[in-house]
Design a protein with these regions (language model features):
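Active-site alpha/beta core segments
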Residues: 31-146
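Acidic/histidine-rich helix-loop elements
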Residues: 16-26
Length: 204
């Protein structure tokens, strides 16, 4: 049987309705993902979450954001809205990857495994990356062959995480009913790009 991993990308209150960068449908997607994990947990050899965990991300944050390269303050490390969505937190998933501490980071593969809520220094984050405490290392150690990606937002961090998994040689699926884009237009563009890179878009 193929070794499979499930990556739950950035399902945080900051990206759900009422959050700083709330996406319409975010809370509903969080609940659907939680139901899926409860029903299919045994199908996966490795499950992880990712989180935006911004400490001082430079010009990724802006008071006058363009919503392309710069954004309002969001995913601020140590705040309730940067925590996992309650529906996901209740699953007690073992592996958590924090990303974007000191720079923009859209892919879960840019993060480090951190199963606490530490506010690390720039040097500590760099040391963790250098030591290989990354999603790529974790998937390799688990002998994973296929990666399923779900979460928020399909048009941004889900897409970039899926593309990085594909570049690393994994068979990749994105469950389209377990993700939501920032907008319909950006979602369609993301799906076109993912399909062009041999990522399978399927219903869960």
């Amino acid at each position: 049987m193929t070794q499979q991993a499930l990556i739950v990308v950035d399902v945080q209150p900051t990206f759900c309705e009422g959050g700083e960068l709330g996406v319409d449908g975010g809370n509903a997607v969080a609940e659907r993902i939680a139901t899926f994990v409860k029903q299919h947990r045994a199908d996966y050899d490795y499950i992880a979450t990712t989180q935006d965990w911004h400490i001082e991300p430079g010009d990724h944050w802006s008071e006058q954001p363009d919503f392309v390269d710069t954004w309002p303050v969001h995913g601020k490390a140590g705040t309730p809205n940067a925590e996992l969505h309650p529906a996901i937190a209740a699953l007690n998933i073992a592996h958590h990857f924090k990303k974007g501490q000191y720079s923009a980071a859209y892919s879960g593969f840019e993060g480090i495994e951190d199963n606490s809520d530490r506010i690390q220094s720039r040097e500590q984050v760099a040391a963790e990356l250098e030591a290989g405490h990354t999603l790529a290392t974790a998937l390799a150690d688990a002998n994973v062959l296929r990666v399923d990606v779900v979460g928020i937002a399909e048009s941004h961090c889900v897409k970039e995480t899926a593309l990085d998994a594909q570049r690393l040689g994994y068979d990749v699926r994105v469950f389209t009913d377990l993700t939501v884009p920032v907008s319909a237009e950006l979602g369609q563009a993301a799906r076109t790009e993912m399909q062009a890179n041999d990522i399978e878009l399927v219903h869960s």
